């Protein structure tokens, strides 16, 4: 007998986002974020990682899309400080305005949520090193621990396979570090699985192997 009320949510969101996700982001779950190209998937995945860390979860973040550790690190600092390091304006100038969803609704019978209210904020300039240091200090103060909650592993596209991910996680386990949450950004750029498979079959097989990470 399974008690759905006892499913452990590893990452919880407040407000409407919390109602949307409910306990989807729970232990043992496999969740895929789908969007068009340049559709903020990476932003969402980093947000999930950040919230998991704030909730004292061990997070393993794999980037398979050619980003460097510095690239991902800067984006993570942006999320910690809630402050951009690059202007979204076409000409790259400051000040810059950024809007994020504040309220959403899902009509009965619909699969997609609609944003009904946005939060707008203007930034006079880019994120600075001093701001990042202060943001990390506040996060460490909240966590009240010297334990490492975040591990990052970046790889060129088509060079990282699911088997490699499992090996890296096993290596961390030998150091007595065990992830609660495993996030793979650019999963569509993972190396093909072993064996001679058609392109579509390779993609399907990789998704099956990724699912096994949570089991």
Predicted regions and their residues:
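P-loop NTPase motor core
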Residues: 2-71, 79, 154-215
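Cytosolic-facing regulatory segments adjacent to core modules
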Residues: 12, 17-21, 57-178
